[in-house]
């Protein structure tokens, strides 16, 4: 399931993030890539110890916590600490690849399964040419280039790439989610059911039928969740 999270970051948060990035130091993105990804990856990233990166990551995590759409679509168990990357100049693209199934967390004592990938766009689309996030999965090929502050989530199993940036710079925040529900198909069913329940409540309130279906939703989640 591919889903757009419109205005995940507020205008004030976005302005703060862009101010933090004005004088940031960037590292070669290949330094954090695996064997396969190193062949395709040509971008830059903020260092792990970057103060700007830490502050932007904290803003993004806070925004995720208040996004009901993110919570119902991903059913998050854990979120990989967000990182910030940049495409432009000589470091302008990332070829076809699949994200690593498991990521080492910063403390090196734990790992996270990458069920869901997420990109939060930090640059307005009129500031750069190219740079589309191209995702190829069971829902068909998709080209994603969103307004600054918007985010996209999609299955971590997807083959995807970032097209070359031919003018300007494309900055974004990226991370992965380990879901309580491992199966993308089961997550989609739960999401569709939750959205239908929301509409039922709006139309009929807490009717006996709505209460019964809510119970079915939670029983399915109880059956499928890995806590």
Swiss-Prot record:
Cofactor note: Binds 1 Fe(2+) ion per subunit.
Compositional bias per record (Polar residues), positions renumbered to this chain: 33-47
EC number: 1.14.11.-
Residues that hold 2-oxoglutarate according to the record: 170
SMART domains xrefs: P4Hc
Source superkingdom: Bacteria
Binding site for Fe cation: 97, 99, 160
Region feature (Disordered): 27-51
Top class in the EC scheme: oxidoreductase
Keywords from the named record: Dioxygenase, Iron, Metal-binding, Oxidoreductase, Vitamin C
CC cofactor: Fe(2+); L-ascorbate
Example of a GO biological process term: DNA damage response
UniProt-recorded name of the protein: PKHD-type hydroxylase Veis_3084
